[in-house]
Amino acid sequence: MNKIHRLLCLLLWIGITAGLCYSQESAGDYVAPSQAGPKGTAPRMQVQLLSSGEPTQQYAVIFYQGDEAFSGLQEFAEKYHVTSAHFTAIGAINGATLGWFDPQRKMYKKIPITGQHEVIGMSGDIALYQGKPVVHTHMVVGYPDGTTRGGHVLEAYVSPTLEVMVTVDPIAMHKRFDPDTDLTLIDPSAK
């Protein structure tokens, strides 16, 4: 009986400790969607128009060492008056913060990415919210051992390059605020 009692106490302690570890996430581990916008700069970004045939335009948006890609894409969208677009990218980064959306908290849990990683894939879209273009992008990064991590891009620092191919569409897409999630979501019926 004494061994069973000790085993039960040990299991209870393990369960409580595991619960405390999970519940000890700090507020700094999360970011609200409204605070998840661009925070850096991309001074070395270069843009080339690849085609301007009807009805779409194709751009190559190239980032270099140290550029913050999310901020650069936002800058591109504003400078070129993008009202609707989608994009894909490959390249490499040296540090990023990705996010996983927690629907109960209505916040992104930060996923820190440190060191050099391959950008296996990045995709996203650009749509208007309150008359301004807003970039929404996700990224999957590869580790040296072949494992991957991914999520919503909060920030990503390029090293040595990130090659983004952007297709700008002729008809504007609009977003609306969704109070159930605190996210701005594309709404095809919005104008």
Predicted feature locations:
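Bacterial N-terminal signal peptides that target proteins for export
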Residues: 1-9
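Bacterial N-terminal signal peptides
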Residues: 9-19
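Boundary at the C-terminal end of the N-terminal hydrophobic targeting segment
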Residues: 21-23
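N-terminal intrinsically disordered, cationic/polar leader segments
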Residues: 25-60, 64-67, 71-80, 84-88, ...
